[in-house]
Amino acid sequence: MTDRIQRLRQESFNAQPSLSIERALIETEFYKENEGKYPIPILRALNFLEICKRKTIYIGKDELIVGERGPHPKAVSTFPELTCHSVEDLHVLNTRELQRYTISQEDIDTYEREVIPYWKGRTQRERIFNHVPKEWKEAYEAGMFTEFMEQRAPGHTSLDGKVYQYGMLDLKERIAHELRNLDFMNDPEATDKQEELTAMSISCDAAIIFAERHAELAEKMAGRETDPKRKKELKKIAEICRWVPAHAPRTYWEAIQMYWFVHLGTITELNGWDAMNPGHFDQHLTPFYENDLKEGILTRAEAKELMSCFFIKINNQTAPPKVGITAKESGTYNDFTNLNIGGIKRDGSNGVSEVSYIMLETVDDLHLLQPGSALHISVCTPERFLREGCKVIRKGYGYPSVFNPDTYVMELMRQGKTPEDAREGGCSGCIEVGAFGKEAYVLTGYLNVPKILEVTLHNGTDPVSGKKVSLETGDPRTFRTYEELYDAFLKQIHYFVDMKVRVSNYIDRMFAKYAPATFLSLFIDDCIAKGKDYYNCGPRYNTTYIQCTGLGTITDSLSVLKKHVFEERKFNMEQIIHATDTNFEGQEAMRQFILNRTPFFGNDDEYADRIAIQVFNDLYDAIEGKPNTKGECFHLNMLSTTCHVYFGKMMNATPNRRLAGRAISDGTSPSHGADTHGPSAVVKSLGKLDQVKSGGTLLNQRFLPSLLKRDEDLAKLASLIRSYFALGGHHIQFNIVDTATLHAAQKHPEEYRDLLVRVAGYSDYFNDMNADLQYDVIARTAQETF
């Protein structure tokens, strides 16, 4: 790591996230003057242009890649058109102990005076909550599910190689061509297309102006700079910012800066849920890297330094703050920019290059909160690359996670993607996959599957709140067979899935109508060709996911009921319901019996695994094929981020012996402490699921550091990954940390400020996590042997 990178890394690590009201003030002033004067797409594009013209430009000392979303690093914009924070929200964000965002009293007063009055009644969040059905609100408040889009925009996507092939001026030419060819006589949508295409062209202008302002600042700084080396760097930065993004990049440095301007544009236009990522960044940069080496204008060390600068830029972009239930289910500074490394090319060949190794080394050197990193390991991936990745995993940062292109390509093809588009896809966000540069996909929020069983056991009533939240499917005390119970559970699944689909489709329409993403649309096929927005059927593929959570908990709970109530009749249903309602008070003998005598998921046990397969398949059948608003359909995902902790807080105890308020299992991982036969048994259980039916499955594993001490241990880890992927596994990730270290970090947080752990699809600083989430990580089974 160079001295420059050490300084930039430390500055980024030390920076305190803050709230900037600059964007909100510019936007509010613009809307006050212009709302109603233009069609909404053009209004949104002109608003973006105004922000790019007026926002503060920042270039830090030592920086080689330039540009920030806010006026300085880790200054987070607010987006009042989506969620207009109240004064109380701002005070809470400024004073809370965890995930604090500083904001001055002067800014709070200005926000209260200038921003809040205008946006009252105009926000997307109000449009959603003022129009959803009463039964949806009650289920939402009970913790049956969450909704991502209630305060953030759908921007969950990744880019492809177009970013490096076309500059903004090229895109404007393509837009002009489409405008000239509009058929106003025979195409009833021609006027709508004209508005959208015009808005896209304005967005191109905005990006060029934004970069030009960086060039001007760099030149001014160069004029004042006394250090010859830095003066030369600033002049080079100015030159690059005058070329990209107006034109396609010519060099490695320009290519990174090109992407960064595009990235900043998308997260400035709207706060898309899970910031975009550059797709197969190593593959896109490889031609530039190789050509620059050949021309003698770049060394490997310089390429790595530029990559490090890029990583630090991502770390500077703290996630916009969340409030309400969304804050409870996803409380983190991490904005989920996840870098795909390795994998396969569009033609199916090995995609690993020297840039892949540079990225992996940068992950190891910096080990910052962001970006996340994901190794893509196909059957054609070189063993050396996997071994180098395992060396980084061993360090205990919680990343990189590991993905299987051989499975996710089949997932994407099953959804209707071409083989080429599927191979060009990969991970965006946590563990979900999409077709890079060609797909808009919406994550609608999480479904609490164990809670659905809890409601089933109480005949449609939530036992925590006492409110009726669902159908009456019968008193389970009267059920004579396991099949009767499961049929009731299945009816409840369909009820909540259908409720979620109904409201998700309404929310989609609200974004298409009120918040088009005209800048993001520039980079997604086939928005320009169709003349349609990213949110309104413009992309080639338009996918909607429902993320199901708690497979381990629901499997183990059903296993308890099937075996001990209906088959062996050790307990009756009344005893189980009473025990879960009273948190097993006075029933420790029952808990121990359940622990020691129940087949649990994650142990390669056919009894439990058959239940998991049935639940997985029935969730798929309930969700798959439900139509969305864009002519395509809903699909199944199996992940949780941190929502499994929130969901657990909303539940009583469950039949599998889990106590009230404790987290349910995450993604498709086994329940904490249930996987007692080692990681090989875990992956065998998971391998029995037909994961190609999903759009992503999450598997967490925790290893003691002693398990990976020797080089031969790394070979065993690599073999475990290969074995799981041969069984059809989609994803696996590891925490390499012992329990003593985690307890020490709780007692002495000041000594463990940079302790990163894997949460669920992302890594976080252990001491930025609340106590419940810390406990969740500690409680995971610590594997001591393969």
Question: Where are the model-predicted features located?
Answer:
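Conserved catalytic cores of very large enzyme subunits
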Residues: M1-M200, K229, E233-K236, I240-F786
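Extended non-globular scaffold/tether segments
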Residues: T198-I209
